[in-house]
Amino acid sequence: PNIVLIVADDLGYGDLSCYGADAIQTPGMDRIANEGIRFTQGFCTAATSTSSRYSLLTGLYPWTNRDAKILPGNAALIINTQQVTLPKVMKQSLILF
């Protein structure tokens, strides 16, 4: 399957026109939303980008890793390369499929 996961920093539910926003038109995102799956009841585990991405990729709460906080662009990896992550699980699932 083709999966496109878009993670946008500081994007709220009402910021895209496909969800009813009228201040800014977002035709590209609207098209993707209309041709794919739209989620209308989601939540995030953290209010900051690094912590949210950490949780999404690992399935863990960000507070389980004290390094999952706002970090500069040159920061060291905060996810151990041996740790199970969403991309690894998806890749393994495709191999078994």
Regions picked out by a protein language model, each given a short descriptive name:
Residues 1-97:
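Formylglycine-dependent sulfatase
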